[in-house]
Amino acid sequence: MSNTTFRPFTGSSRTVVEGEQAGAQDDMSLLQSLFSDKSREEFAKECKLGMYTNLSSNNRLNYIDLVPKNTGSRALNLFKSEYEKGHIPSSGVLSIPRVLVFLVRTTTVTESGSVTIRLVDLISASSVEILEPVDGTQEATIPISSLPAIVCFSPSYDCPMQMIGNRHRCFGLVTQLDGVISSGSTVVMSHAYWSANFRSKPNNYKQYAPMYKYVEPFDRLKRLSRKQLKNYVRGITNQSVNHGYLLGKPLLKTDEQDPEMIVLEEESLTPTDSNGVGKDKIAVTAKSVAGLPTASLSINRR
């Protein structure tokens, strides 16, 4: 074979067919679900791309493969055939340089508990009956209240393409919730990104502990410009709704003024004159003010 490196995909989170996940309450139940006849049929289908993993207290542990099983099977058969012919030096390895996991909180900031992410090698399940982190270090635990965050993993070796029981050996991601109060509902959503290569020559790499960064939540009130505020007011102001027949009021004529009209003074966003009065004013109905960020606005009656 002239080219002994294959790039079958560069992807993002893959879950089992129809967006399902392998979930369980403890390690033994998780392993049984992974290696059962049912899971063998489900994991035989290509995993979907771009799927978020929902984490809830119902399924405290979740697992996803980093390679769709059909893709891994085809690569294994191809490399094995070429190896037996003497065209390549090995039966192939899976190389994943790094895995980037984005975690988002989907519950109140007062939620207790934490989320743990582990990069695992399925070989650990056959030897110690538990999915241990790769290198004993590729694991990170983050309080749910501190999310959003990004975690990066990097294994120090390439994974041989071989069979472990009735499954292909593969790198995978385990997510685990601990100390969560909410019952049944999704409290965290995770999304992973990585690239995977199949190679004929294995290698070792410098070992790193997982790196993670907390992401500053977007401040959707503070970062509104004056133009955005005006557009927001125009977008929520609908005369046919505020004054329409559904509310028992006729539509206003163009030369009439509604007695309920108020003025919004953009104090922090608009230059003021010597008397401290805002130069730019936006007239909207009292009913359409709901939802506006009031921290930088004052409301005065005419």
Curated annotation (Swiss-Prot):
Leader sequence residues: none
Location(s) in or outside the cell: Host cell junction, Host plasmodesma
Example of a GO cellular component annotation carried by this entry: host cell plasmodesma
Pfam families xref list: 3A
InterPro entries for the chain: MPV
GO BP annotations listed: transport of virus in host, cell to cell
Keywords carried by this UniProt record: Host cell junction, Transport, Viral movement protein
Major localization class: host cell
Function: Transports viral genome to neighboring plant cells directly through plasmosdesmata, without any budding. The movement protein allows efficient cell to cell propagation, by bypassing the host cell wall barrier. Acts by forming a tubular structure at the host plasmodesmata, enlarging it enough to allow free passage of virion capsids.
Family: Belongs to the bromovirus movement protein family.
Name assigned to this protein: Movement protein
Organism: Cowpea chlorotic mottle virus (CCMV)
